[in-house]
């Protein structure tokens, strides 16, 4: 009885599930192995036919399953003794014949009925999969490798010819067939010799494939991919071929360009080669041909010979041994830039060009990256990227993204050459991001985790621009901005001063010193360079852990000062703001103090030296306000036991300035002195929160006591009137501001009237008119003027002005009107006054924000103390936490009075989210002299105010949590006996609340809930 394989397994071989296909193949091979030959020869033939026919299925999963199983069936037959093998598998050659017979596309020849395109496609791809089934292990080694090792190339040559025949059937199967052949040759490369390589090349010549992308890839594989070239020096070719049988020989560049462009090349009348039209029936494929993956890496593997460095004498002696190959720059220019990105190139060709750029960035070494940004490439890239309606806009944007990705993956070799070529190369532009609307340069600069060497090289690119492009304002400004962006993106990684020092030096020179040939453009750079320098220092200041060869330099500000001093002492340039004798003495004394401070390595000395260095830099910048600060810092450094009040006021003065660097620096230095901060220093900060957010408050904070007193006296009356009739604090502020504005407007109108009177009197005098022609209001009496005109009409011919008198009168009139214009310009208009009021309010609010930031630093310090819970901190813990209770009332008042919601939210977050989150048990050692009950009463008084301000919900919520927090502290320190006092206080508050309170009942509910939680504890103790 003959055996049979399970027919259901053939259906499972076509499954979309990989595991099911695999199990079906294993089961079918088991069934087939159990059959006996020659009894079951018919079943073997059925299986072979069924598997080969199954390859022509239009389902890809079916082709995969049947191809996998076919490999195992062939392998099973090959391992049988000769003579016992099944029909169709007697040998591998017989299998090729069987495959061609079953999957024959010409089966309908001679009949009127033609094969459908779908069926033809299935048969051709089925045959390809049938041939590929021979390439799976272990069949591949059994058939191909063993034959080549024996020097037998018959089957390999037949296999090659069958693949080529199949490839030439239809254009849509051409590339898959040739890629399969290429992969086969690549696997057999270690076992091939010159003879087998020659046979392959002759087959390519036979089919006229030498000068095609497929032929090119084969030549490159045989010549450069192996340990040595397998291409013989002489080939008997019938069709045109490559010069010296090497596609990359220098003389082959024009021909190589035409081949890569997929153009047909034929011999001309002179024995040369000429390009013809594109091959017929060639379908455009939006994928790059695999020849590029072979060609591009060759330019970086060192196998291409370059004799440009060899002396002429050596060239003459070794001319026969050394061959000059095409190098990447010339290849890219002709084969890519002038071919795929030519102005007349089609969109399809340019599309492939963008794919070539992508492939080149991944394949070629970093030294060649710059050549990729050639003229036509840059033009096309910019033109296609700038407009989203362009045909190639999407692929151009994808190309830019792939460039960024390639630089991210290999920043050490690709980032700097890419940026250099993109921005400063022969075809680059500093406006690349703007031209392409892509932000590519910004992304490249911001690549994370760059090695220090790459970071130094990146900064060096823009440093060279500062050196080479001194006279070009746009380049210099771009270089300054780019350096700032680099520092901003990598400020955490920049901890070595040797990286930044070469870059900072030209910026310092540009900011503080005159150039030898200063013109108007370069003068503009002084201020720009100074601003960028301050911004760079502001970014770098956050990194305190820095390395420097000079141990004395401990901050970026000190390094900047050192650079200024070095340039000044070298007499390279003159200071823009030269120092007089008095300032020189102040500077020298400050530098002496700075040297002494730097010898100490404490956090406080670092803060003091950084602050002193920054003030000296400001002195060189012409900031006269820094003089008093320098003197105070020098005096502070001379004494060991100093009050922190002076430093606090200095930091506040820096905090009030517009420069972000000074604001950031003041907070950082405040952190260094935070352990020494006492209640007196904190009270200075808390007093600022009480300042009114108007011109009066601005004068109080920024203009000194005298100016504040004057403004206060002028505005007292109007403020009292506005306060008595208002329903809320915001209305009071508004009425006060309106009154101030009205008074200022009346005063301004009076000044304008006086100026007009003076101008009119001067005009009357200059024109020799009677004094009484001007009335009390400073206006000209028109009736009198007409009378004078009538009286003088008869005598006008008697007397007339000569030219000299006319010129003199003209000068007098010009001077009068000039003085009037200057006087009027000094008077604020209505819009100017409104702007000044708004600016004053914004400045006060902004200053309060920064003060809250300083208070937050102290709160954070207290949090660290409580978390540390160390014995060495136990004595200091109670004192530090005690000061926090003094924050409550000033902050509540600030929220009640402020017009700025973000400020109210920030204070609320600090109180409720930080201070009140500290466990009350940590306050057990706090100062007993603090009157907590007094603070509670003040809190309740604020709670019952009829003017909760513009942020009533935030204000009342803070009052409730503040009262509850103070109540918990009161009980924690005084014990449960204090609960009665708290209940009495809340009872009294409840009575007042019933009569005039505007807050909600949640304040009392929160207290009751807390009492409920304490009740059980009290009962347990009793």
Swiss-Prot record:
Gene Ontology process terms (BP): maturation of SSU-rRNA; positive regulation of ribosome biogenesis; regulation of DNA-templated transcription; ribosomal large subunit assembly; rRNA processing; rRNA transcription
Q: Which Pfam family is an annotated match for this chain, by its short name?
A: DNA_pol_phi
What InterPro entries does UniProt report for this protein, alphabetically? ARM-type_fold, DNA-dir_DNA_pol_B_CS, DNA_pol_V/MYBBP1A
Give residue spans, biased composition: Acidic residues: 706-719, 728-748, 781-802
What do the Gene Ontology cellular component annotations say? nucleolus; small-subunit processome
* Annotated region (Disordered), positions in chain: 706-748, 778-805
What keywords does the record list, in alphabetical order? Answer: Nucleus, Phosphoprotein, Transferase
Enzyme Commission numbers on file: 2.7.7.7
One example of the protein's molecular function in GO is: rRNA primary transcript binding
Query: Which reactions is this enzyme annotated as catalysing?
Result: DNA(n) + a 2'-deoxyribonucleoside 5'-triphosphate = DNA(n+1) + diphosphate
Q: Modified residue Phosphoserine is at which positions?
A: 789
The compartments listed are:
Nucleus, Nucleolus
Q: What class of enzyme is it?
A: transferase
Q: What role is this protein assigned?
A: Plays an important role in the regulation of rRNA transcription. Binds near or at the enhancer region of rRNA repeating units. May have DNA polymerase activity, but it is not required for in vivo function.
**Cross-referenced PANTHER family, in alphabetical order?**
MYB-BINDING PROTEIN 1A, MYB-BINDING PROTEIN 1A FAMILY MEMBER
Q: Which family does it belong to?
A: Belongs to the MYBBP1A family.
Q: What else is known?
A: Present with 4490 molecules/cell in log phase SD medium.
* Protein's UniProt name: rDNA transcriptional regulator POL5
Q: Which organism is it from?
A: Saccharomyces cerevisiae (strain ATCC 204508 / S288c)
Q: Recite the lineage of the species.
A: Eukaryota, Fungi, Dikarya, Ascomycota, Saccharomycotina
Q: Which gene encodes it?
A: POL5
